[in-house]
Amino acid sequence: MIVFPNAKINLGLQVVAKRADGYHNIETVFYPIPLTDALEIEVREDTCDRLSVHGVPIDAATEDNLVMKAVMALRRKFDFPPLTIELIKHIPSGAGLGGGSSNASFMLKLVRDYFSLPIDDEELAAIALTIGADCPFFVGNRPVLATDLGQVFTPLPNFSLSGLHIAIVKPPIHINTAAAYKGLKHVGKRETMPDEIVYMPVEEWRGKLVNDFEESLFPEHPRLAELKEMLYRSGALYAAMSGSGSALFGLFREKPQLDKAAITDCFRWQSIIP
């Protein structure tokens, strides 16, 4: 049985408060996009699970892979046979696209459906939350306003980017998330929340729908700012960094012709949003 875990983008990201526990509360819109990995399972005649990962390299030992953490989380509640697991990675890691979290949540759903486990999406989302703050998003996989640590979701009725073209570029730059939070120049609520701005025409988002990480990370990594401007030069209605990076995305009316010389060393992907 095979599924295709998809990525997400952040539409705006406001860091609204630093908490007493050292973490930060955020306000952001999560939107699913059709950039996918592939995840397949079958029962194996053995005493333990086996995970094989192919495609885009990921920097994690097998036991630390979120797919395996998802399997073990379900094993604590249900009894099911050992699995052979094949994960083919297309979503780059360390990009702000939620690839690892998506893999974990899709693994939960895949095992649930494969073995007809008696657990609904709400219970599955609760398990997903123990793996990562944004993992529950991929259980429902619909546009939401994410608040608190990014795990409290408010649906966004009638909000859709369907029909727009999207381009993603990720340079070979690694962003340490903890360091990115530490370097923030703005922490606090802004006048307008992301879920209000996204209902405006996309052409009006520029300058309003802000990712707070850009202010601190762009001076440190000028290449990120250059790529964002390249997306605008290529005709983007809106362009931004996703999460704490280092992937950037642009939204377009027509299929864009990107500056190939500017992205020769980048991961790049384009599609139409369904």
From Swiss-Prot:
Keyword Kinase tagged: yes
One Pfam family of this chain: GHMP_kinases_C
Binding site for ATP: 92-102
Active site residues of this protein: 8, 134
Gene Ontology biological-process entries: isopentenyl diphosphate biosynthetic process, methylerythritol 4-phosphate pathway; terpenoid biosynthetic process
Record's catalysed reaction(s): 4-CDP-2-C-methyl-D-erythritol + ATP = 4-CDP-2-C-methyl-D-erythritol 2-phosphate + ADP + H(+)
Listed GO MF terms: 4-(cytidine 5'-diphospho)-2-C-methyl-D-erythritol kinase activity; ATP binding
Matches recorded under Gene3D superfamilies: 3.30.230.10, GHMP kinase, C-terminal domain
InterPro entries noted in UniProt: GHMP_kinase_C_dom, GHMP_kinase_C_sf, GHMP_kinase_N_dom, IspE, Ribosomal_Su5_D2-typ_SF, Ribsml_uS5_D2-typ_fold_subgr
E.C. designation(s): 2.7.1.148
Role, per record: Catalyzes the phosphorylation of the position 2 hydroxy group of 4-diphosphocytidyl-2C-methyl-D-erythritol.
Name listed for the protein in its UniProt record: 4-diphosphocytidyl-2-C-methyl-D-erythritol kinase
